[in-house]
């Protein structure tokens, strides 16, 4: 039945002269026999539909083919298959990849998965030689390889997107390093800062996000291929040869672990969740700042929407969607944790659920970054409104207390005296800047005329010289550190 003159082989020879889409049905029927030998009944349609994963794992076609090319090269080099057959397989796979990418070959949605489709196409083109590709390999270690290769590429893409956002933040921070606005705690005006300082807070968060992504990739960059289904293989394979071809730093130390864990997916989803936390917080502030209650910024028309009934509306929909989509990524992380928490070693079909979750997390983060970065880049900063807001709310009260500390008064006493002054101002409708000096001196005789310079907003910001603070010079240093970090970043 399995000889060179079998019905299957006759069909394959015939199919070589036909367009790819014509041979799909028969070819996938052939590949369905990969695991059918033990079974006496045909697969129910419901089972086939429920079991299939090609509709979401087909995005890994390039990684699947590239991994198979490396595997075939190794099989030939190690004498496990004839070198001439290895070369034919590699050439055939290369042609399949080119045909898919040119649009000449469509991935069959009726295939069980991308691995089955690729091997089926190869066998249709090469006959018996194509069937040798899967020697010393299981779909268990094959899919573990494909996911790692795919996610390494996606990490690089997301890191590049974050770097683009960081470049925009550094540019905006440089432009606004002297623009004063209120800093908030509990959403109450607290102390004066600069808009550049505020932007660099998010830059610091995103730098840590980049660090985490690099760290995830480092642990992910271990080759699982060669683990077999779970117990390795009896063939004299060279795993490190494959690792070198595919740019992996090492090979998995344990074959059970190599095929049965998806902690690298969970780690990536966790890192991406933190990216979304930071984007969501930033989005929340953008949404507030755009409102008439703040009016600190205005988004470009190209990154805003209107209302179907209220003609005056200009809505920050991108920021709102980023804030909302954070929940999707958190949900993807929860999905992965739930899938993996209760399955015994080694591979279980539950693990097929890993791909939709991690791919959704990846795609969502990329989509958000692609919209968020140009929104920030084109955003107009309403500097006068920021300054006007900083003039209210007694945000220079701490500086007033520090003035008394500089005169020798203990901080707690200085704090109490300043609190009394603020209470007076509230009762009389004044600010600390407009409160007469005699009222200052009635509370504490250490006050003198120079207190007005001390509590001037520009002075308040300029004298906050501690490392990481809001003064323009400090913001300059923060920008320089981020730029140096980006220059050295490994991805």
Walk through the language-model features, giving the residues of each:
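Charged, flexible cofactor/metal-binding loops and thiol motifs
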Residues: 147, 174, 182, 188-342, ...
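Glycine-rich cofactor/substrate-binding loops
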Residues: 32-67, 128-129, 310-491
